[in-house]
Amino acid sequence: ETAAGAYPIEAVQTMVKIAESTEASINYRKRFKERTTLVNPDITNAISHACCTTAMDLNASAIISVTKSGFTARMVSKYRPECAVVACVMNKKAYRQLNLSWGVTPIMMCQLEKNTDQLFDLAVDTAEKTGIVQQGEVVVITAGVPLGVSGTTNLIKVHVVGHVLMKGKSINDKVVSGNLCVCKTASELL
């Protein structure tokens, strides 16, 4: 049955059901764990694989890839991570192309920041504003240094979505984090 046939709507509905049931029946986590070696052991591929492994181990809500050409986001996508794959791009061509990649949600970023900390904050804030990630969730971020140069993917950061309201030192000299509740009255403490 084709679009020229007597039942084009039913044909498309059947194709959708087949595609959805096929995607749902594949255990991507198992397939990922069974993969023993990288097919193309270059830096971008290794970083993409490490991002997926880290996201799976930490049950991250998203992998955020700051990418100029979209290549890193596509490399992450090929491993079929369970979490969202967000591609932060600065040009429309890469944005349009990434709309066709499996599991990738491209979002436009208006500017390129001067350092990685600012860039990561902007990428996470942009993903949060679009509703892809929420406060308190863990995300894995990947990008390349020098910033804005295609083909330089070389770093990973694990980040908790939210803004640091205060810093201090724990009793055991280790890094800790937690939720902070700001109360203005004693009754709000309860």
Each predicted region: which residue ranges?
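Long, charged amphipathic helices and adjacent flexible linkers at domain junctions
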Residues: 13-52, 152-186
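C-terminal binding/interaction regions
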Residues: 134-147, 154-157
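Conserved mixed alpha/beta catalytic, RNA-binding, or beta-rich assembly cores of soluble enzyme
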Residues: 61-64, 69-74, 78-84, 166-190
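Phosphate-interacting basic helix/loop segments used at nucleotide- and nucleic-acid interfaces
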Residues: 43-60, 119-137, 184-189
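Nucleotide-binding motor/catalytic cores of P-loop/tubulin-like NTPases across gene-expression machines
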Residues: 72-74, 80-115
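Glycine-rich phosphate-binding active-site loops on the catalytic face of alpha/beta enzymes
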Residues: 1-8
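Flexible, glycine/charged-enriched surface loops at secondary-structure junctions
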Residues: 1, 22-35, 61-63, 133-138
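Structural signal for hydrophobic packing residues in well-ordered secondary-structure cores
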Residues: 16-26, 55, 80, 84, ...
